[in-house]
């Protein structure tokens, strides 16, 4: 899709821990397909994921580059399952802080409700519990999803509501 023909260029930052790699990849495919649908309406969505940043040494921490991209995005989407990685939490805080200052990015948190192998649970589950509590204390709405199809459906419903306003 040629984004030069689009009248609206929407930047979406996707944050999650590596445990949700499959969901991240499927979300990227979903955004690509949505672009094909939305292009006729003059909309192009650019998905920003950490995998697309170069690994070259940065003048600051590479995480600072991600945080800058978060602050310059229109929509921030974070996914959680059994842990909340420190960088994902940092990105959430940057997005939420920027939203409070400027009204952007719109912040979405999606929590996966799925089967967990008890043997795979580590102390990192506490990071998830602490983060979930933090989100609740902020009064931020979190969305539960069962699988990738459910996530895509819920996010598409949100896109249909917000894209005309962005």
State what each model feature region is:
Residues 48-52, 110, 145:
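Conserved beta-strand termini and adjacent loop/short-helix elements that scaffold enzyme active sites
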Residues 22-23, 56-57, 87, 116-122, ...:
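Switch/connector loops and helix/strand junctions flanking conserved nucleotide-binding motifs
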Residues 98-115:
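A short helix->loop->beta-strand "cap" motif at the edges of active sites that frequently abuts
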Residues 58, 82-100:
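Conserved TIR/SEFIR loop-to-helix hotspot centered on a Trp-containing motif
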Residues 25-26, 60-61, 90, 123-126:
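Generic recognition of short, well-ordered alpha-helical segments
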Residues 1-75, 79, 101-105:
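Conserved N-terminal substructure of TIR/SEFIR domains
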Residues 1-4, 113-166:
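C-terminal interaction surface of TIR/SEFIR-family domains
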Residues 63-67, 71, 89, 93, ...:
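Amphipathic, non-transmembrane alpha-helical secondary structure
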């Amino acid at each position: 899709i040629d984004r030069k023909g689009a009248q609206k260029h929407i930047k979406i930052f996707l944050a999650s821990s590596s445990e949700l790699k499959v969901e991240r990849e499927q979300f990227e495919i979903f955004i690509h397909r949505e672009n094909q649908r939305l292009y006729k309406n003059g909309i192009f969505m650019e998905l920003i994921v950490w995998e697309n940043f170069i690994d070259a040494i940065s003048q600051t921490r590479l995480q600072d580059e991600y945080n800058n991209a978060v602050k310059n995005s229109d929509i921030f989407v974070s996914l959680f399952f059994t842990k909340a990685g420190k960088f994902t939490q940092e990105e959430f805080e940057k997005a939420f802080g920027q939203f409070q200052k400027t009204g952007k990015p719109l912040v979405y948190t999606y929590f996966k409700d799925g089967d967990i192998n008890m043997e795979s649970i580590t102390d990192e589950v506490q990071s998830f519990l602490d983060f979930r509590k933090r989100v609740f204390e902020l009064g931020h709405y979190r969305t539960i999803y069962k699988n990738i199809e459910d996530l895509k459906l819920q996010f598409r419903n949100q896109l249909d509501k917000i894209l005309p306003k962005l």
